[in-house]
């Protein structure tokens, strides 16, 4: 499988994908030069083996060909994406038909206490399940499933292309 992790940060989730996709290839994408460098350090062995690459870029205009990936993940990053529908359409573009898009957020948009983060972190926007589902379906994703933890207010969404 070919996996893309958008907003790969320090690369921990890339390492987890590499463990799960032993015969696959994982690409990390991040806007930050620092994150790209850190992801590269953490996953240096896999990069050397040709199983991984890290790319600097923007989710709203990704440097990948159409239908490049079987699975796309976003852990704790959609909060910062510049225009949800535009970015989801770009995810849809780089995914293969039948591919899976996984979104995991530690905030489900229902906990008022989480709003403190949007005040402290410039450009952050917390979305609830309905907002994410609506934006995904608007750009052609289907079979959108949500899984949440009411106590911790976590939200995971899985959608198919």
What do the PLM-derived regions correspond to, one by one?
Residues 2, 99-100:
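Short glycine-centered segments of the SAM/dcSAM-binding site in methyltransferase folds
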Residues 100-157:
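C-terminal alpha-helical "lid/dimerization" subdomain adjacent to the S-adenosyl-L-methionine
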Residues 60-71:
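A short acidic, Gly/Pro-enriched loop at the edge of an enzyme's catalytic core
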Residues 85-97:
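A short glycine-rich, Lys/Arg-flanked "PGG" loop and its adjoining helix->strand segment in the class I
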Residues 71-84:
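A short SAM/SAH-binding and catalytic strip from SAM-dependent methyltransferases
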Residues 48-49, 65, 142:
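Conserved H-loop
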Residues 4-61:
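Class I SAM-dependent methyltransferase SAM/SAH-binding core
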Residues 159-161:
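C-terminal beta-strand of the catalytic ATP-binding
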């Amino acid at each position: 499988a070919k996996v893309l992790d958008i907003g790969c940060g320090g690369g921990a989730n890339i390492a987890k994908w590499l463990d799960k996709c032993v015969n696959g290839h994982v690409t990390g994408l991040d806007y930050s030069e620092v994150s790209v460098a850190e992801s590269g350090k953490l996953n240096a062995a896999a990069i050397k083996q040709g199983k991984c690459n890290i790319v600097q870029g923007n989710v709203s205009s990704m440097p990948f060909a159409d239908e490049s990936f079987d699975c796309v993940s976003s852990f704790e990053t959609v909060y910062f994406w510049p225009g949800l529908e535009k970015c989801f359409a770009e995810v849809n573009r780089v995914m293969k038909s039948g591919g899976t898009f996984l979104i995991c957020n530690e905030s489900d948009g229902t906990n008022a206490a989480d709003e403190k983060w949007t005040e402290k972190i410039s450009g952050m926007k917390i979305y609830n399940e309905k907002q994410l589902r609506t934006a995904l379906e608007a750009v052609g994703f289907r079979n959108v499933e949500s899984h949440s933890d009411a106590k911790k207010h976590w939200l995971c969404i899985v959608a198919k292309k």
